């Protein structure tokens, strides 16, 4: 017994049904998109009202400021994106981060002869707070990172290098690749590294270790100690806390800004 083929009418009916399903799906997607857009607009309006109401807290309280910026990020709003935007004018955060960026540059310049252009986030935070005075608006490490990212975007040579549980702030336009970063992380414990330590910990060949250390020396980011027992020590002054923990002196500030 032969099976009968599918007729033209059945095919047309099937295509019509598929078209209706597709049309219905498009309508549903458009409805969902419109609903989401409406919700985002409402959230943005509420966020603006919240910002207006808590303006002083956002400006004065670092923790509150972080929470507010996280809220902004959820809807793609960046209060720092423009110095003349709505958020900047309402909160004054544009001027705040601009001024903070200038202070970061000043501290890094004043300490460059000590650390070669690398400084821990903790030390930078301490020095910035000292420079601002007790009555100035408080700043957090999160504020510093946000300001540094803005400086980095301007092509100023600033960078942020993760080291253990903290960060090293690079303020010179030296090229640091992954090998350099790994060695900096290794030096975090003692403030220095040796060729043997690098070979043992990272399983590198001698030449690879020497090339990385020579580059750090050349860029002024490391100091060579040939008097150390055993073998030469390569000190990273940014990690050698005893070297830079003292406050910037008036003479150093004068040298940095004649």
UniProtKB/Swiss-Prot annotation:
Q: Has the keyword Transcription been applied to this entry?
A: yes
Establish whether keyword DNA repair is in the entry: no
Q: Where in the cell is it found?
A: Cytoplasm; Endosome membrane; Nucleus; Late endosome membrane
Tell me where in this chain the PTM Omega-N-methylarginine is found. 4
Recorded hits in Pfam families, A to Z, give: EAP30
Instruction: Note the coiled coil stretches, chain numbering.
Output: 27-53
Top-level taxon of origin:
Eukaryota
Which example biological process does GO assign this protein? early endosome to late endosome transport
Function statement = Component of the endosomal sorting complex required for transport II (ESCRT-II), which is required for multivesicular body (MVB) formation and sorting of endosomal cargo proteins into MVBs, and plays a role in autophagy. The MVB pathway mediates delivery of transmembrane proteins into the lumen of the lysosome for degradation. The ESCRT-II complex is probably involved in the recruitment of the ESCRT-III complex. The ESCRT-II complex may also play a role in transcription regulation by participating in derepression of transcription by RNA polymerase II, possibly via its interaction with ELL.
Family to which this protein belongs: Belongs to the SNF8 family.
Q: What is the name listed in the Swiss-Prot or TrEMBL entry for this protein?
A: Vacuolar-sorting protein SNF8
Q: Which organism is it from?
A: Mus musculus (Mouse)
Phylogenetic classification of the source organism? Eukaryota, Metazoa, Chordata, Craniata, Vertebrata
